Amino acid sequence: MPVTTQQLIQWKQQGRSIVALTAWDYTIAQILDAAGVDLILVGDSMAVMLGYKTTLPITLEEMLHHAKAVCRGVQRALVVVDLPFLTYQESIPQAINSAGRILKETGAQAVKLEGGYPAMVETITRLVQAGIPVMGHVGLTPQSVHQLGLRQQGKTQETAQRILNEAIALEQAGVFSIVLEHIPADLAMQITQKLSIPTIGIGAGSHCDGQVLVTSDVLGLSERQPPFAKVYTNLRATITKAVQDYAAEVRDRQFPE
C-alpha cells in the first residue's frame, strides 16, 4: 500500500521511525522504493549533482523534469518535492502555482518549503487550504546560504526559541511533517515532543521521528559530505575501478571476447 501523509502521522503516534532519502532519477527511486524507504524527497540538493555550487540556481522546470522520473519509479513511498528558490517566496499566488504544477505534472504527493517566518507560515496556510500537502523545513535552510551559511543553527537560547516557535507555527499552518536540519539534538528532541506531527531529522540527533540523508552522501558518491552524514558504501571508488577495468580491457582488446 502506498504511504500517505496521514500514515506518517500515525507512525509518530505508534513510535515507528520514518526512513527518508533523496532521489533525482527513475533508477535510484526504484531502488529506494524496493528497499523499503518510506519517504523519497526530490530535493533541490539535486543542484549540486548537476554541478551547481549551491541549491539556489536550480529551476522549477528542472525539478519538474526530475520529479517526473522519480515518480515513475515509485510504487509505495511518499514522494515529496522541494520548491526551488524564488518559486514560492514572491507571492502566495506564485507559491500555489508552483506547488500545483508539482502535484499535477509529476504525480508527487507533497511539496516542501523552507522557513517558518510569518510570511512563509501564511503562504503554507494558503497552500494547505488549496489542498496541497506541505512539509515544513526549519533550522539550517540551504536556500538561505548567503544569509546564514551552512553552520549549525539554534545554538543560542534566542535562536533555539525562534526555531521552536517556527515549528509550532508551521504545525498550526497545517504541515504534515517538518524537516529539522543541523540543529542541536536537545532542541530537536524538544520540538519532536512538542509537536503532534512527525519530525524528520538531518543532522539533528536521534530523537526525531525519522531521518533523511542525501542519497549520494549515503552511497559515497559525493565529493564532500556534511559532518552529520554517514557513508554506508563507497560507490565513487567502486565505479571508478569498474570504469578503469573496462577501459583497460578495451585498450588491450580483451573486451569483447
From Swiss-Prot:
One Pfam family this sequence matches: Pantoate_transf
Database matches in SUPFAM superfamilies: Phosphoenolpyruvate/pyruvate domain
Residues bound to 3-methyl-2-oxobutanoate: D44, S45, D82, K112
Record bears the keyword Magnesium: yes
Top enzyme category: transferase
Alphabetized CDD domains for the sequence: KPHMT-like
Reaction(s) the record says it catalyses: 3-methyl-2-oxobutanoate + (6R)-5,10-methylene-5,6,7,8-tetrahydrofolate + H2O = 2-dehydropantoate + (6S)-5,6,7,8-tetrahydrofolate
Binding sites annotated in the UniProt record for Mg(2+): D44, D82, E114
Signal peptide: none
Domain of life per record: Bacteria
InterPro entries xrefs: Pantoate_hydroxy_MeTrfase, Pyrv/PenolPyrv_kinase-like_dom, Pyrv_kinase-like_dom_sf
Assigned keywords, A-Z: Cytoplasm, Magnesium, Metal-binding, Pantothenate biosynthesis, Transferase
Homology family: Belongs to the PanB family.
Subunit text: Homodecamer; pentamer of dimers.
Protein's UniProt name: 3-methyl-2-oxobutanoate hydroxymethyltransferase
Organism: Trichormus variabilis (strain ATCC 29413 / PCC 7937)
